[in-house]
Every structure is written in structure tokens, then in C-alpha cells.
Design a protein with these regions (language model features):
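Two-component/phosphorelay signaling modules centered on CheY-like receiver
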Residues: 2, 14-31
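Active-site residues of response regulator receiver
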Residues: 11, 54, 82
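Acidic, metal-coordinating helix/loop segments flanking the phosphotransfer/catalytic sites
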Residues: 32-50
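Acidic catalytic/metal-coordinating carboxylates
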Residues: 35, 61-64
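Short amphipathic alpha-helix used as the core "switch/output" element in two-component signaling
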Residues: 41, 56, 63-74, 92
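C-terminal output helix
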Residues: 86-88, 102, 106-115
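AAA+ ATPase active-site-proximal loops
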Residues: 132-150
Length: 150
């Protein structure tokens, strides 16, 4: 049995946090935070696979939180949520490192699919890196033996 992915939901609106938590907790380990400080405390404590953050967190910015989260040694995949959806906001979030963007009101099936797609993408990136490392190692060993034989 595999360990479920860890999701962090960051939103200053309690009903949004709790609704998402209830929707996702059957498939994932879910943490919730109401602001950037709570989110960073969780992120620094345990590795988080995916962070869903609202654009506006009271007086704080979800964009800034993404920037902080991506500087961690094990950065989460970041997905921006907002009721203030615009193409400009989506582009800016992705320029700052967000994997994707979703608008409120949230379609819970869409959020679930988006998270699973993000996790699959990260898994494929890790597998690709490992295969690349193995190929490089193989060719360096073959080059070594070619030099030894000549």
C-alpha cells in the first residue's frame, strides 16, 4: 500500500478550507491553514506534495506564499485558487512557479483531477531524472572501458 500524497489547503475562508478538506481527505492526507504564517509552519515541518492556495489571504498574497514555498528544500506543487480569475492573474501565478490555476467557485471534481494530474507529472519528472542518471552512468562506464581497452 502506498502512502497517500499530502495536500495543504491555504485559504482565509474557513468554509472553503473545510469543504476542500472534506472533499479530498478520502484520497489524500490533508492539512489546512488560514494564512501564510500557518502554511509556512506546516511546510517547514512536513514535506507537502501539493499546496492549494487562495490568491487573497486576508491582507496577504497567495503569490508571495508560492514564492516562499518554492524556496524550500522540498517545494510543493503549487496551485492557485481565486475568485478573481483573469488570464493576467493566471499567467502571473504560473510565472511565479504555480503549476496551474483554478477559479472559484471550485468544481471539486476538477480540483481532484488537477491534483492527481500534478502528482502524476511530478512522478514522471522524477522517473525521467532517474532514467537520465542511469543512462549517463552507463555511458560513462562504457566510455571508461573503451579507454581501458584501447
Amino acid at each position: 500500500m502506498t502512502t497517500p500524497a499530502t495536500i495543504l489547503i491555504v485559504d482565509d475562508e474557513k468554509h472553503t478550507r473545510e469543504g476542500l478538506r472534506l472533499s479530498l481527505e478520502d484520497d489524500f492526507d490533508v492539512y489546512v491553514a488560514g494564512n501564510s504564517a500557518e502554511a509556512m509552519e506546516i511546510l517547514k515541518g512536513d514535506p507537502v506534495d501539493v499546496m492549494l492556495t487562495d490568491l487573497r489571504l486576508g491582507g496577504e498574497s497567495g503569490m508571495d506564499l508560492i514564492g516562499q514555498a518554492l524556496k524550500l528544500s522540498h517545494p510543493p506543487i503549487c496551485i492557485m485558487m481565486t475568485a478573481y480569475g483573469s488570464v493576467d492573474t493566471a499567467v502571473e501565478a504560473m510565472k511565479r512557479g504555480a503549476y496551474d490555476f483554478v477559479t472559484k467557485p471550485l468544481n471539486l471534481d476538477e480540483v481532484d483531477i488537477l491534483i492527481k494530474r500534478a502528482l502524476r507529472s511530478r512522478t514522471l519528472e522524477k522517473e525521467n531524472s532517474e532514467l537520465k542518471r542511469q543512462v549517463e552512468k552507463k555511458f560513462s562506464i562504457e566510455a571508461f572501458w573503451a579507454r581501458v581497452r584501447s
